[in-house]
């Protein structure tokens, strides 16, 4: 079903295999310059149970709209570096720089423990010396 003209078949196959599916690059400039937008396809994926998380930070890019969607829709926050070459070409560790990463608050050190934490949204995103909140915040009115 992965070699199919209907992209939903890939999501159905991934879900059937128990995959943890998350949306990468919600604020990708090449796709939607200067805004982070929730498209109809994302509603379809979310409503169908095909999306468990969203990447709220990628490299030095942070997508506050994506973080709010995670809070509103009870999705897991993910952060990635998206580095496609040796890390030291982008990160200067001697200056205290670090890659963007997902902190997973697992109850045990195992694959199952990590998956359980992801499923229950026990993550935080470490990006540019800040950590996104791992739990809901009250919005200011």
Where are the model-predicted features located?
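Extended substrate/RNA-proximal surfaces in nucleic-acid metabolism proteins
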Residues: 1-50
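Charged catalytic cores and adjacent phosphate/nucleic-acid-binding surfaces used
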Residues: 31-141
């Amino acid at each position: 079903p992965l070699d199919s003209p209907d992209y939903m078949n890939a999501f159905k196959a991934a879900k059937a295999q128990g995959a943890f599916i998350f949306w990468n690059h919600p604020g990708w400039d090449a796709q939607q310059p200067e805004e982070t937008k929730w498209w109809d396809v994302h509603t379809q994926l979310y409503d169908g149970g095909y999306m468990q998380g969203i990447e709220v930070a990628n490299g030095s890019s942070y997508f506050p709209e994506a973080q709010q969607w995670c809070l509103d829709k009870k999705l897991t926050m993910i952060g990635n570096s998206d580095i496609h070459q040796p890390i030291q070409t982008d990160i200067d560790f001697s200056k205290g720089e670090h890659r963007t990463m997902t902190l997973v608050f697992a109850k045990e050190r195992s694959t199952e423990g990590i998956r359980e934490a992801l499923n229950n949204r026990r993550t935080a995103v470490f990006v540019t010396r800040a950590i996104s909140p791992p739990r809901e915040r009250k919005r200011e009115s």
